[in-house]
Amino acid sequence: MLVDNKARSIGLKRQALLDIARGEYIAFVDDDDTILGGYVNAILDAAKGKPDVITFRQRAIYNGLQSEVVFGVEHQDEPFTPGGITKRAPWHICAWRREAVAQCLFGNTNYGEDLIWSKQARRMIQTSVHIDQLLHEYRHDAATTEAPEG
């Protein structure tokens, strides 16, 4: 069991989780994330082919504004588009084959550690599968988050 004593940065906490992970795939789900119906079965089915990363669609709500985020290896990171579609390269919330990204490290920081790690992991991708389903929801509220704004 890991206990959050708040003495470490978010990046070091994520790294500790990655270091003890033993499953074939890893994905990070935080308290502002919700996995939607069908997530586990869809990921397990897609993992049968052993791709380096499994991407999907996400509902993102940022300070009350909503967008659908489509993760895919063919995409660059677009700015959040309220009321529309936002295309992004794979992030840490996607399912990653642990062995493919084992050498990627989270930085000792409380902001942007997810993007730092994701950019490293993206360079390791040789194979991918995209699940064209809404499987994840991200809900950010500046009034309640503990994460610093960047």
Cite the ranges covered by each PLM segment.
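The conserved acidic donor/metal-binding loop of glycosyltransferases
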Residues: 30-34
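Short aromatic/hydrophobic "clamp" motif used to bind/position activated sugar donors
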Residues: 26
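Glycine-rich, basic loop-to-helix element that forms the pyrophosphate-binding segment
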Residues: 5-21
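A recurrent flexible, glycine/aromatic-enriched loop bordering the glycosyltransferase active site
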Residues: 61-63, 75-96
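Conserved donor NDP-sugar-binding/catalytic core segment of glycosyltransferases
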Residues: 40-69
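Active-site donor/metal-binding and catalytic loop motifs
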Residues: 131-150
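Conserved nucleotide-sugar donor-binding
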Residues: 22-23, 89-104
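Acidic donor-binding loop at a coil-to-helix junction in glycosyltransferase catalytic cores
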Residues: 111-117
